[in-house]
Amino acid sequence: MKLIIQPDDGPTVLLSALKNAKKSVEVAIFRFDRNDIETTLKAAVGRGVKVTALIADVNRGGEKNLRQLEMRFLQAGITVARSANDLIRYHDKLIVIDRRILFILSFNFTHLDIDHSRGFGILTKNATLVQEAVKLFEADCARRPYTAGPDSFVVSPANSRKVLRTFLERAKKQLLIYDPQISDKEMIATLQGRAKAGVEIRVIGKMSGRANVMVRKLTRMRLHTRTIIRDGHQAFIGSQSLRPAELDSRREVGLIVREPKVVKQFLETFESDWNAMNGGSAQEASKEEAPSVTSQKVAEKAVAVLARELRPLTGTVKKAVKKVVAQAGEEVLHDKIVKSTVKKVIKKAVKKAVKEAVQDSEKA
């Protein structure tokens, strides 16, 4: 078993495994913009490897990219399946190679997640876990119901709530948690109960009703992982936050990990991130400052993308104004109240759309 730590490890481990695929690659995709991974998947097809991609039906704001990805994959000879719409989202991220190697990831196949965010991934050759991942993948590709397998393979909505609640309840000394948003009432009550019992609980991320729980916001990079380290001996890593939707209404996948070396790496990374948010050492402080330049570049790139995406909006507004003029006459263009109202309506609509897009990105 191997732990992948982002952004430190980058795509190297994934690319190497894909390049060494001999018979098959099965990949579940929620967000995707990595040319290096796309090129490697296409090259695998060229070697005679059967590549199957299960692509999410929706990921608010990115459906156009997903549909374009489907077409590129199909043209390259990749078999494409699209997730059903029975759940709010299919948010899992996994890869099965030659039906003997399994990757379970908290991060998407994007530059933002891999290069600029705290995320984790697990590579395992455990035959039981690989078999269960294949069972889930095939069920979702065929849009058949999935029945939960071993508790170590955590799937929403099949068994996540039960397994993760039990995982938290069994903490004796400590729970260290990465989670962008803990808001499920049952999970919060469980955490508060363990805190009252003397269990040390620290959260990097956000948590509602956090009595007796220490919470800090990750400042040196974006947070995009859901991880729980219990008593320094076991860990959960997956795509599901402790939120109602991600436990009950979305496809999410995670693993319970007991490998000592991997759990130790989780623990060390958490402590490093935690300490960096509390003054830390001079070395930690310098690391915290370093991403600021990168963050600026990411922001500039995001603004450029936003500007391109907003160009069609101009045409839409023009059409709407012409329609109003056609119905009410040109005099409305000289009415200050009408002009002011139109500006406010457009500004409000854009503001709402941007807010929803940002919230969706944080939850993805």
Where are these regions (language model features)?
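PLD/PLD-like phosphodiesterase catalytic module centered on the HKD motif
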Residues: 1-15, 19, 34-103, 107-166, ...
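Residues on the solvent-exposed faces and adjacent turns
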Residues: 29
